[in-house]
Curated annotation (Swiss-Prot):
Its main location: cytoplasm. The keyword Zinc-finger does not apply. The gene is Eif6. Keywords: Cytoplasm, Initiation factor, Nucleus, Phosphoprotein, Protein biosynthesis, Ribosome biogenesis, Ubl conjugation. It comes from Rattus norvegicus (Rat). Phosphorylation at Ser-174 and Ser-175 by CSNK1D/CK1 promotes nuclear export. Ufmylated by UFL1. This is Eukaryotic translation initiation factor 6.
Amino acid sequence: MAVRASFENNCEVGCFAKLTNTYCLVAIGGSENFYSVFEGELSDTIPVVHASIAGCRIIGRMCVGNRHGLLVPNNTTDQELQHIRNSLPDSVQIRRVEERLSALGNVTTCNDYVALVHPDLDRETEEILADVLKVEVFRQTVADQVLVGSYCVFSNQGGLVHPKTSIEDQDELSSLLQVPLVAGTVNRGSEVIAAGMVVNDWCAFCGLDTTSTELSVVESVFKLNEAKPSTIATSMRDSLIDSLT
């Protein structure tokens, strides 16, 4: 299921929300309408939490997370950290990271198994990422852009990358991530895909300007039509991966 939304008439929903398979963070403020769109789709399965990070509402660009954990920048206040800790499931680890490239959502992107990071990210941050989020980390660019977190979005089912990504790059990224990739846009031609949408294994939220063609591409590449919110599928995949490794 792919749904359109906007935050105070702003279609960059990926800036104001962070969605994973175990929780969803939504920026404080804004209209209640934005929050209720997420709550309407997700509240039966995962917690939807109002939050700010380092006093900012652009939480989607400030943090990186998956079902195992959440990394936030070092300037996140104790109060914000405590609120997020209290609101998320106990199984989710939350860690503050001291990183020069502090907009973590712009310089890293991940699903539950693999992460792509900015080529200049600190080694220490890379280790924390691998440890807390339980992912394999690759230093990569997307269409020669170092901000991999801005120009690429992927779940455990599929991924959408910058429209100018070459076929060779798509194939390389696809083999690293082990999911099918499609080059495309959101919000009527926006190349900054991660700012315009958020996605997990069964649901996507795109900006209000997203065309029906873009929406159908999102639904097909992320396999949202056949998807059900299910921890069973996740645990089955985990056991399969364990048996293969």
